[in-house]
C-alpha cells in the first residue's frame, strides 16, 4: 500500500509516471517550439489518468498537490512537489533530464529502478499543461500516465474537457481519468 502511494507521489511530481489496460503504446507529440523558461514556476496537479491499478485503489484518497518547476544545471528541469501524506506535508524533487527535443525529458525512478519518458504535450504556459509519461516498471508492466497541470487550483471546465479528450485518445478509459479535489493543506509557500 505505502509502495503504491510512494510511486504515485513520485510520478505526480511531474504529473508523472501499473494493472494494465489493453491499449497500444501511444506516440504523443511534444509542444511545438517548447519554451522551458515560460514553463517554470508554480503548477497544481489537477487531473491524472493512468493504466496502473494503484490509481483505482487510491483515487478516493488523492488530492491536488502543488509543484514548482525550476531550471536544472544540465538543461533539464527540477520538479518539486509538496503533497499531503499521512497528515503531514511532504516535499519531493524530481530531476527531469533533457530528452531528444525541447519538451521531452526522462526521469529515473529510484523506487522502480526504471526510466520513464516525460513529454510536455501541450501548454499555453499561463493556464495549463498536458504531460504524458510512459515506461516500464518491469517485464510486462508497461506504465502510462497523463497529467493535467493548472496554474490555479480551479482549472476551467474546457481544460478538463480537453484533458479528458486527450486521455481517451491515448486509450485511457473514463474510470481511469481522475480530477483531483482542491485542498488547502500543503498549498502555502514554504
Curated annotation (Swiss-Prot):
GO cellular component: extracellular region; extracellular space; Golgi apparatus; nuclear membrane; perinuclear region of cytoplasm; rough endoplasmic reticulum
Signal peptide positions on this chain: 1-22
Gene3D superfamilies: 2.40.128.20
Keyword annotations of the record: Cytoplasm, Disulfide bond, Endoplasmic reticulum, Fatty acid biosynthesis, Fatty acid metabolism, Glycoprotein, Golgi apparatus, Isomerase, Lipid biosynthesis, Lipid metabolism, Mast cell degranulation, Membrane, Nucleus, Prostaglandin biosynthesis, Prostaglandin metabolism, Secreted, Signal, Transport
Reactions catalysed according to its record: prostaglandin H2 = prostaglandin D2
An annotated GO BP: prostaglandin biosynthetic process
Keyword Thylakoid on entry: no
Swiss-Prot/TrEMBL domain comment: Forms a beta-barrel structure that accommodates hydrophobic ligands in its interior.
Protein name: Prostaglandin-H2 D-isomerase
Organism: Macaca fuscata fuscata (Japanese macaque)
Lineage: Eukaryota, Metazoa, Chordata, Craniata, Vertebrata
